């Protein structure tokens, strides 16, 4: 799992697998 910006804004960090 990698924590990265999953939003267009790139201001939010979510859990992306």
From Swiss-Prot:
InterPro entries: Hirudin, Hirudin/antistatin, Prot_inh_hirudin. The keyword Kinase does not apply. Keywords: Protease inhibitor, Secreted, Serine protease inhibitor, Sulfation. It is found in: Secreted. Residues 1-3 are annotated as: Interaction with thrombin active site. GO terms for cellular component: extracellular region. SUPFAM superfamilies: Leech antihemostatic proteins (SSF57262). GO terms for molecular function: serine-type endopeptidase inhibitor activity. Pfam families: Hirudin. Sulfated. It comes from the Eukaryota. Belongs to the protease inhibitor I14 (hirudin) family. Hirudin is a potent thrombin-specific protease inhibitor. It forms a stable non-covalent complex with alpha-thrombin, thereby abolishing its ability to cleave fibrinogen. This is Hirudin-1A. It comes from Hirudo medicinalis (Medicinal leech). The lineage of its organism: Eukaryota, Metazoa, Spiralia, Lophotrochozoa, Annelida.
